[in-house]
């Protein structure tokens, strides 16, 4: 996929994210990369955004916008974005995860983003990941560093759609359809 990107500022992004820009030529069509993780005991992993982030308490997958560090010789390395965000938000190394970019989010009237979404399979359980995350969060607090995910949310894959719908948190617009595609896709493969 080829696209031409122009640098903007955070205020432009936040305004479009929170209020929305109707005029097509002024929209902030942000490219981003993310990964939905599945533990070895069949839980899908989401994060609840911290209260100090752009969308407080919102549920999303680990991921975020393209950063200058993700661009090499004018080429955006989406896997580098995913790697960086996964490290920042959960403190996992993408190099240790079997993953594949499988889904693309295209901008529409409501959400002005290009999302490149990977699925990653972890070799640890829900409990092991939870313990890892809690230790990481303590380290961030101790060192007065930014917390992006306040907590992890685990959805049992076989019941993920229902569990997601029961949660009262705001959710990124792509999340419900992504979970459905993953669950239904696996049902088709059974």
Name each model-derived stretch.
Residues 1-61, 65-84, 91-190:
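N-terminal leader/linker segments that precede catalytic domains of diphosphate-processing enzymes
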């Amino acid at each position: 996929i080829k696209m031409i990107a122009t640098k903007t500022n955070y205020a432009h992004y936040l305004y479009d994210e929170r209020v929305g820009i109707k005029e097509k030529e002024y929209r902030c069509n942000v490219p981003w990369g993310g990964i939905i993780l599945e533990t070895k005991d069949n839980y899908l992993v989401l994060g609840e955004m911290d209260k100090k982030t752009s969308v407080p308490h919102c549920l999303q997958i680990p991921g975020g916008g393209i950063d200058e560090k993700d661009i090499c010789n004018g080429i955006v390395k989406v896997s580098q974005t995913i790697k960086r965000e996964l490290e920042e938000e959960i403190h996992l190394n993408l190099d240790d995860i079997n993953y594949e970019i499988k889904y693309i989010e295209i901008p529409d009237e409501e959400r002005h983003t290009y999302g490149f979404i990977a699925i990653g399979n972890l070799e640890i359980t829900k409990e092991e990941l939870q313990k890892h995350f809690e230790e990481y969060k303590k380290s961030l607090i101790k060192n007065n560093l930014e917390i992006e995910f306040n907590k992890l949310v685990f959805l049992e894959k076989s019941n993920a759609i229902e569990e997601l719908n029961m949660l009262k948190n705001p959710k990124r617009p792509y999340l419900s359809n992504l979970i459905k595609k993953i669950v239904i896709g696996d049902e088709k493969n059974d």
